[in-house]
């Protein structure tokens, strides 16, 4: 803390937010301007010795060639020279004149803020507002955008109408951080981006002020792990008094004037102590009595509030080797929180904006305890040390001061309370200067305040010239509220009675923690392909509403630049395909990868490569990331905070361990948010759909909720709320739901667009053809669709098409027969839910559920709701409450609560909802339950099997028709929802669909590069588009591309050799050089798979194409095949390239980064059941191991011998 004033308040704030934040300007040069004279070394410093040769690593000497002159700034220690161009942006003159330097004044009158009877002229306010708004939009890289211009117009209109304007919350956050960044007297500014801003502009009374302040202290103290924070109360308004905090700091020790003129306690606080006594405080008589707060609402007298003792963390001081030191009875408080300075942002003034950081040890050890006008313990300590105090040449003052500072550091570290020594603080400031020179071209700094009170030239800042000037936003000193024109409403008429004081203390205790819950905003982002992540995010939103102000957004609805101003973000996301983001998360992913701070805090510069590839390659186990994390932890308070310095975050990933890159996108988002400076509140959660995903999410959500309310101090009863949300005894409440008749019926295509939130169009069937032999027991079909040349259905070979199928009519009718009290068959309905009212708020009301469009119950079950997937444990819990037979109720409860039993039941039976109802016939089935609790029927994705150049206006699909029996082949027959529907279509039938691009699975632009294509079964689908496109290039464009190699696999040459004639024709026309086929069930032949072909016949070619000719390899098929092919290729590269297996793995990683090893992986098939069972067993063992001693949602990543990454 800065300690330069002997009477009245102490002017300076903490190290975490600066050594003083004062604004006295260096008078050697007058106000900072383009014409300022070059700065010189401090006048009282000794003449510098000849500087050493400049360090070649220092910034080069770069004076702007033309235009105005800028201050020349030299570092006398290393000889480096820079020019402060930022000083040209200063709009305010300093206090100095050409004949007088006032730079050493603590409170230059010219720079103190005083309440004015007349508001600032609109032109002046508008000028400052425009400058600030431009700063803000430049910071988010939107300068000159339509949003920027629109915001300027809004501010101008508001000023014209009201004479002032209001900041948006994001602008307030930015402005508060910039004010800290611009504070010339602050040595700890490297952490400016980590300032937590609490918006208290809705405060209306002194009691509410106290509530905010208590929560500020609790949050910032954080049990000794201090966090920088600011609470901003309402701005100054014309014709109204100010909100003011009379105390100079939120925590201060009283100073009692004695009859002999001496002071017991802190002499700096005598005046505020006497004011507190006048307002009814009953003082103690100790040296370290914590003062109450005097808080003033506009035009009201100040009110007295005593801080609850449990809120103020204090540190008893002891010495590591001098045992007698503890007997001195010294102590100091942990949290330095300046409360009497004014915050100015864009011309708006906030007279009450307390801010806090952490101490630099010399603020306590040298200034507070040793200054003659403070506690003045220097000589007492020197005597105890047996030092000669009779002569200054014994340096007794210096020796005693060092030991006192050592005691302070030792005591705070022993108590685990954040503190920084002056050497570390000044070294971090030098790094901050370097950062700011690169980012802004300069940094305002007051040399007299930056250099610490001891060690002078032993610190690097002593040798650094500095330029002092005023930038906006800024912190400013202001006159005491009980003096002069600021004293309106401050008169003291009487002392408060004991009862009134007791009531004030009672209010102090009761108000703590009651407001923050409504004020801390939480943003919940989801990325989802199937809707499950969205459902989980909505559950999370309901949970966080118990203690926060949450909003739930899809990633594609969220502006990523808002992350810099967020307080708490929770991410729930799935991973699509080959480790990619879900489609509605792609824009978020790209923007997140492009984000950087003022100084990029990433562990390494980003290379120019696909963000999808980057997401697949980032992991928490990355050694570079681990090294960066370790370094960041060691220098938490002395290093740059990063772009997301104030963000706290938690991430949960959904996935399946059957797929490579399990939860890859979630892991990458988790790592990237930390790289950008965010603080992880909870380790990454992962939910495996093969084993206990719902339980994993429930456990993670409760843990995330607890970590969040502990971090933001929003109330101790939040844990009970979490248990209520995820309680296994939740019941279906019929009275909370109803169906309402709707006038308008369903239009299918707009309805699908509403449900899936994506653009969708309708294609028409041209033909459906079975590609397998009539002797085959299975079917694979070629579906030809007419696109009508619609722009929305334009595609490239390798892309995917999404199809929205209906459920089978027979299944729908059987389910309808089980619904109790259904609505009339042809009547469109909507579900309405009874929203609870709140005390003082709106009464209970019926609100329509927006998930589905108005439609009949039959239409909902046919087109929008998933009735074939096994019901989730949550749905089974609800069904158990609707069962009339107690035995069925108990069985359903057991299934819903025992994860292992549920997974075994689901895996063996794979039951549809109808089969569950047949197994538990006493369950009643309300229509609203179906419409609100069933998951959405998701689109099915297929690789496009054609090229637009070969078949204009058409899209072809290659689809395996799925039919199988559950229960080891003895259960009911199940059909693939989409494949069965497609197989039954006739020419002219409509097909709702959309295109999903796959830019990472396309032939290289250079046709001369060799390519190897590997695709068994329907994995050949995208390659048909490849060869059709190449044929078109050969015959229409005259190109001569390099012949490709195709490796295909099927069961039997006479049954399911798909597209054999087409492939042979393409080979004869020069598209393929080699075509090899693996038969797994060919009579009188051994089983052969595509990976066997690669190993036995193509090993040399694989190595040559990938390592020597910069060629490409494409793999398409199910997850088991793709993993086996990958392992085979790795072994081939190791053998043919004479390298270790790990080295070959690194080569494949490079190939993926270069987008030369491509994978198009689709879901589980019947053939993968054995492998999937093994993965489920591994998942169960992981879960059980964690249940014995850890948490089920933080599953370990699979080992190198498992199918997962």
UniProtKB/Swiss-Prot annotation:
Region spans: Calmodulin-binding: 492-512
Stretches for region Interaction with NOSIP: 100-488
Xref: Gene3D superfamilies: 3.40.50.360, NADPH-cytochrome p450 Reductase, Chain A, domain 3, Nitric Oxide Synthase, Chain A, domain 1, Nitric Oxide Synthase, Chain A, domain 3, Nitric Oxide Synthase,Heme Domain,Chain A domain 2, Nucleotide-binding domain of ferredoxin-NADP reductase (FNR) module, Translation factors
EC number: 1.14.13.39
Residues noted as binding FMN in the record, renumbered to the chain: 528-530, 532, 574-575, 656, 663, 689, 693
Binding locations of NADP(+): 778, 1018, 1051, 1080-1081, 1087, 1089, 1091
Quaternary structure and partners: Homodimer. Interacts with NOSIP and NOSTRIN. Interacts with HSP90AB1. Forms a complex with ASL, ASS1 and SLC7A1; the complex regulates cell-autonomous L-arginine synthesis and citrulline recycling while channeling extracellular L-arginine to nitric oxide synthesis pathway.
Entry protein name: Nitric oxide synthase 3
Organism per entry: Canis lupus familiaris
